[in-house]
Amino acid sequence: MTKIFADSSINPLSVAPMMDHTDRHFRYFLRQLTRHTLLYTEMITAQAILHGDRQRLLNFSPEEKPVALQLGGDDPQLLAECARIGQDWGYDEINLNVGCPSDRVQSGNFGACLMAQPDLVAQCVSAMQKAVEIPVTVKHRIGIDHRDSYEDLVHFVEIVANAGCQRFTVHARKAWLQGLSPKENRTIPPLRYEDVYQLKKDFPQLLIEINGGITQTEQIQQHLSHVDAVMVGRAAYENPYLFATVDRDIYHKTNLVPSRAEIIERMLPYVEERLRHGDRLNQITRHLLSLFNGQPRAKFWRRTLSDSTLLASAGPELLQTALQAQKFPGVLVA
């Protein structure tokens, strides 16, 4: 029996923060498929929030909620200030990135390399929790390099939990900090789901969320028999229509499953609004390219959006043109 939860701290399903993917346009698009799944920003560094363009980095549409802000950093006080800003901006959760293995992130001493510094992570969590009233959570790997035993994982979680963190999102792969690219670190290290299941058994008072290699609703349901929540990553971007049925199948809501055409119709007012605010059409439509993934003539959809959205004159009507091309491929002028 699938658990049903209400607030963001115990939401049973989420979409992972993904650089260059989970921006406000993708989140708005995904919200047309699922009203309840917890969505995340891309990772935003503390320095960027404190010294950058906050409107550009943090603004989102109310329809995107519930939405969590993922932070990157290693300074407890700076992260606390960013958490306060995120709460004031209207985010439902603050998440600390302890999972990204990229060289650029490591050079700033945050991301996955922080798994070797659980006391520092605990200090960061404690400072952020004191600064805000919304949940503060941690996303991390199952281990790093040769610190990848189950005992190492328990040691990390225990220290951070003692600082007050109650929700842990565990990517069920270790990360190699040297020798593998971030993309390779998402596929080469083997998945160890059993370790995450065992973590829930050993820490029943904590909310444990599993992440890694999850691509189907049936897998989500299977994992929910072992842990509190499931986070879906690349599959949400490569096959977003997967989420059209989760409100029914995971949250047991009675809302109708939208068709792909209905989703496009729902996007049109948003596209018009964002264009009025100066956004470019391809900033939005690039997230829609995989909507027809696996469907007949899907290539006509992708080709229309990819070939045309760079045109300065392109407007919302291009989505309708692409939809017609997907249905009737002969309508396009070469």
From Swiss-Prot:
Keywords: Flavoprotein, FMN, NADP, Oxidoreductase, RNA-binding, tRNA processing, tRNA-binding. Its cofactor is FMN. PROSITE patterns: UPF0034. InterPro entries: Aldolase_TIM (IPR013785), DUS-like_FMN-bd (IPR035587), DUS_fam (IPR001269), DusA (IPR004653), tRNA_hU_synthase_CS (IPR018517). The keyword RNA-binding applies. The active site is at C100. FMN binds at P17, M18, M19, Q70, K139, H171, N211, G212, G213, G233, R234. It catalyses: 5,6-dihydrouridine(20) in tRNA + NADP(+) = uridine(20) in tRNA + NADPH + H(+); 5,6-dihydrouridine(20) in tRNA + NAD(+) = uridine(20) in tRNA + NADH + H(+); 5,6-dihydrouridine(20a) in tRNA + NADP(+) = uridine(20a) in tRNA + NADPH + H(+); 5,6-dihydrouridine(20a) in tRNA + NAD(+) = uridine(20a) in tRNA + NADH + H(+). It holds the Pfam family Dus. It comes from the Bacteria. Its EC number is 1.3.1.-, 1.3.1.91. Belongs to the Dus family. DusA subfamily. Catalyzes the synthesis of 5,6-dihydrouridine (D), a modified base found in the D-loop of most tRNAs, via the reduction of the C5-C6 double bond in target uridines. Specifically modifies U20 and U20a in tRNAs. This is tRNA-dihydrouridine(20/20a) synthase. It comes from Synechocystis sp. (strain ATCC 27184 / PCC 6803 / Kazusa).
